[in-house]
Amino acid sequence: MSLLGFPVEWRVSDGMVDYKAALDFMTSRVDGILEGRESEMVWLLEHPSVYTAGVSAKDGELLSENKFQVVRTTRGGKYSYHGPGQRVVYVMLHLGRRDKRDVRLYVRNLGLWVVGTLAEFGIDSHFDDDNTGVWVQYSRQAKKIAAFGIAIRRWVTYHGFSVNISTDLGCYSGIVPCGIAGSHVTSLQDLGVTVPFEEFDAVLQQKFDTIFLQ
């Protein structure tokens, strides 16, 4: 249940969802939440391969313009990759009505949500406030397993985060991920953990309830 008196809709999309279509949907949904016509929502999906540029992205951080489609967005952050094998989570919550008008706390709670979920699969990770994301130590290196990029309109959140489940990590070669030169990425599969999306999603929902519905 939502703290607002009606359920948070939990939607899982089958197949690939076009990135621009997802942007249009989120814009419409935020309008509906603000106007009281629609409920808050958590949307789980996959995108076809795409590079997305947040409001802080710099041209020099796009290393290959022709590798995949490039879409500029209104979310925070820099360049990121979305594609098959990655669980994308878009979170549309009304922080104003929840009396939680604290952006840093919201982002930190997203991080705790991911860290708690990964722990259920035996993965020790941590959320980094400075280099926003969830990181693991692997082969003596810090590697990012989840990337974050949010937007907020009149205290309704949208966009969210992505977790690499079985992502082709070579797809990151065309960008400087999140603008952090020399950074490395990983996935559950890369860490030797095989998890079906359905199982991962179930734990995500359980952990969401413990963090956001208390």
From Swiss-Prot:
Major localization class: cytoplasm
Subcellular location: Cytoplasm
Site note Lowers pKa of active site Cys, residues: 144
Pfam families found in the cross-reference section: LplA-B_cat (PF21948)
Source superkingdom: Bacteria
Active site per database record: 178
An annotated GO cellular component: cytoplasm
Pathway the protein contributes to: Protein modification; protein lipoylation via endogenous pathway; protein N(6)-(lipoyl)lysine from octanoyl-[acyl-carrier-protein]: step 1/2
InterPro entries in alphabetical order: aa-tRNA-synth_II/BPL/LPL, BPL_LPL_catalytic, Octanoyltransferase
Enzymatic reactions: octanoyl-[ACP] + L-lysyl-[protein] = N(6)-octanoyl-L-lysyl-[protein] + holo-[ACP] + H(+)
Listed GO MF terms: lipoyl(octanoyl) transferase activity
EC number, UniProt record: 2.3.1.181
UniProt keywords, alphabetically: Acyltransferase, Cytoplasm, Transferase
Residues given in the record as substrate binding sites: 75-82, 147-149, 160-162
GO process annotations (BP): protein modification process
Record domain BPL/LPL catalytic: where: 36-214
Further remark: In the reaction, the free carboxyl group of octanoic acid is attached via an amide linkage to the epsilon-amino group of a specific lysine residue of lipoyl domains of lipoate-dependent enzymes.
PANTHER family according to UniProt: LIPOYLTRANSFERASE 2, MITOCHONDRIAL-RELATED, OCTANOYLTRANSFERASE
Free-text function comment from the UniProt entry: Catalyzes the transfer of endogenously produced octanoic acid from octanoyl-acyl-carrier-protein onto the lipoyl domains of lipoate-dependent enzymes. Lipoyl-ACP can also act as a substrate although octanoyl-ACP is likely to be the physiological substrate.
Family designation: Belongs to the LipB family.
Name of this chain's protein: Octanoyltransferase
Source species: Anaplasma marginale (strain Florida)
Highest classification ranks of the organism: Bacteria, Pseudomonadati, Pseudomonadota, Alphaproteobacteria, Rickettsiales
